[in-house]
Swiss-Prot record:
It comes from Trichophyton rubrum (strain ATCC MYA-4607 / CBS 118892) (Athlete's foot fungus). Binds 1 Mg(2+) ion per subunit. Its cofactor is Mg(2+). Gene3D superfamilies: Phosphatidylinositol (PI) phosphodiesterase (3.20.20.190). This is Sphingomyelinase D. GO terms for biological process: lipid catabolic process. The active site is at H59.
Length: 323
């Protein structure tokens, strides 16, 4: 629990330009941490086999229909783009007047319901588009409260996803202070700066998630063995460093070269975001084909890899037991 005095010290006045969105958060935020800001516990713990668990992460799940489609396709984690608006948090990638999907509260209710019905949904990755937004009570505290009231009691863990450019903001500093055993923090970017950010902020290795990718990784894939900026190289360096609890790549679509998909998996990524490049998730033959590609590699390597289940804890170094 973080003290109110310490929390207020994070929230110094100053205008915050919201990245990737025309929305501007007001200066001088005033966030209050609820008194019942606790860590729900509804997680099972059962050792699996020694094969490494792999997360198949549905991309841009912005509607309740997208939740149902992704879980029906076999996704075991969901990536939800999150944008704050004056009237609430929404599943929204672009932050435009016509781009919002469902309210986050409704999305979380749907995910929790599916999890309680037996769906394999290990965690929700919150891709935070304007994490420092703060208006009408819509701020990072209210978002985390939704996670802890709706997702976590159902057994769904949470990944708070930031970009390297957002790590100096109020939201990042708040989240890192109050992470519970069901939550982790992710930074997307290049390996070396991300590793330095995590070290500087004193975040435990098992709570660190490094991600690297491109809307089409083929455009800057690299050789996987070079020291350049290619996506595959960044992922390989992240895994070999042992500086992160998990390493995820993105975005695999029906247009991604099959050999590139396989190479990302061969360097040891713990999961891949898959789906459409520029649209929200829904049932479509292209998405189903992408899943077949990823699962094809898993089938060929079943002695060493398997799809993660709800019993696998992504925020544990062993990945097989709850914290």
């Amino acid at each position: 629990m973080i003290s109110l005095l310490r929390l207020c010290s994070f929230l110094a006045a100053g205008s915050i330009l919201v990245q990737g969105s025309p929305i501007i958060a007001p200066s001088a935020p005033t966030w209050d941490t609820p008194n019942n800001f606790t860590s729900p516990s509804n997680f099972t713990s059962k050792p699996g086999n020694e094969a490494s668990p792999f997360w198949l992460i549905g991309h841009r799940v912005l509607t309740k229909g997208g939740v149902r489609a992704a879980l029906g396709h076999g996704a075991n984690a969901l990536e939800v783009d999150i944008t704050g608006w004056w009237n609430g948090w929404y599943g929204d990638h672009d932050g435009l007047p016509s781009s919002a999907g469902d309210k986050v509260a409704d999305l979380f209710d749907e995910i929790a319901y599916r999890r309680r019905q037996g769906a394999q949904v290990s965690f929700v990755w919150l891709d935070l588009k304007n994490p420092d937004f703060n208006k009408n009570g819509v701020n990072i505290v209210s978002l985390m409260t939704l996670c802890r009231e709706k997702l976590e009691p159902a057994g769904v863990r949470v990944l708070f996803g930031f970009y390297s450019s957002q790590t100096s903001g109020h939201a990042f500093r708040f989240v890192k202070q109050v992470l519970n055993e069901n939550e982790a923090i992710g930074i997307d970017g290049s390996f070396e700066p991300v590793e330095k950010d995590f070290e500087k902020n004193g975040i435990r290795v098992e709570k660190r998630v490094f991600s690297s990718g491109l809307f089409n990784p083929d455009f800057n894939f690299g050789t996987c063995q070079d020291r350049a900026s290619g996506v595959c190289t960044q992922l390989r360096e992240g895994k070999e460093s042992h500086k992160f609890g998990k390493v995820f790549g993105w975005t695999v679509s029906s247009y991604t070269r099959k050999d590139h998909v396989y190479k990302m998996m061969e360097v040891g990524v713990d999961g891949l975001i898959y789906g459409f490049v520029a649209s929200h998730y829904y049932n479509h033959k292209d998405i189903r084909q992408t899943i077949r590609t990823i699962r094809g590699w898993l089938d060929e390597h079943r002695d060493t890899h398997r799809l993660a289940t709800n019993d696998d804890n992504p925020w544990s170094m062993s990945s097989r037991k709850s914290s």
